[in-house]
Amino acid sequence: MTANALGGPAPVLPPNQTPPGGVTSPRTGPAVPRGRVRDLHPGWFASVMGTAILAVATYLNPGNQTAMQGAAHGLGAGLAVLAYALGAVMTIVYAVRWARYRDAALADLHHPVLGAMHATLPGGLLVLAVMTSVVGPQLLPAGAVTALIAVLAALGSVLAVVISVAFAMTLFVGAPPAASVNGGWFIPPVVTIIIPMALTPLVAHVGPGTARLLLALGYAAYGMGFLLFLMVLGLLHDRLVLHPLPPAQLAPTLWIGLGPVGVAALAPLALARAGQDLFGVAAPSVTVLSQLFGTAIWGFGLWWLAIAVTLLVRYLRAGPLPFHLGWWAFTFPLGAYTVATVTLARSWQAPVLEGVAVLLYLALVGFWVVVTARTVTATHAGRIWHR
């Protein structure tokens, strides 16, 4: 083992593999295009997730200031277009990589750090579906909005479950060391929890039988993802308590815990709203219970946010964090928690929570701007392609 920046041993990783984003190789200059596709980092879709959730958060106008409504909708729509463009490009590149360089993709899937990041692909598709339900009506005809949500939700849901099972199997049979447990393992669970958020906008556009099926699938996916989140949470807690802190390269992954917390707070509310007609006289009770449960989960997020900020400060005091694509972990999780805060603030009609949402949103914008700028710079210089 090698020592990390905080004095502890770095996690054991398989030979010829690197932490998320990779450590730059001895090569200089950009790699050839074929090599870029073959060695494509599986976490690129995190940029889609981060940009799409920022579009949603912006469109919701944190602070709920009437004077800002038009600007919020306009900026949210612009960010949505950018997210669509990123999603289209990344989908094509990911498909080419799996079709032409399957061995390289499978090798990454078996990596204890990179493997979980394959779930950013379905995560990106599902967050685009959620974004389409919020921002889409301003950009697309009503029929196109519903069709696009259906396609993104179907494809994203299937891939979310498949990749979650596949990555879990690589861990079960690969017996990785305890020190390799990291916050990236939250990605498959949070992506599964997003499934009901992508399915619920379709409930109003289908018949009663299909609506009941969509709600049942939504609750089932929620249970699957939430319980997986709790299992990973226990593993990561033990790893942080019983072992030295992860190396600086893995510091951003500790923020990913905010993702499942934020989405887990949002999904019950979305399911309750979508099922109003089907729940009948029980609908008000379901709504209240969903709001209470979501608020309780959100409360845990405050604790996790405090831990994530404190650990980040500790890492920064030990030295600068090396930039890599894993920095996108600062965006979607915080964005999901921000959207959850906005939603709960308006459910409770609590101005104080709305103020908290504004602070979280400003932090989200700051992270997104910095990470986007660093990504563009590293891409232009060719450093982003080195593994």
Indicate residue ranges for each PLM-predicted region.
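Transmembrane alpha-helix boundary signature
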Residues: Y94-R102, V130-G143, M169
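Small-residue-rich transmembrane alpha-helices that serve as helix-helix interface/gating elements
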Residues: I297-W298, E354-V370
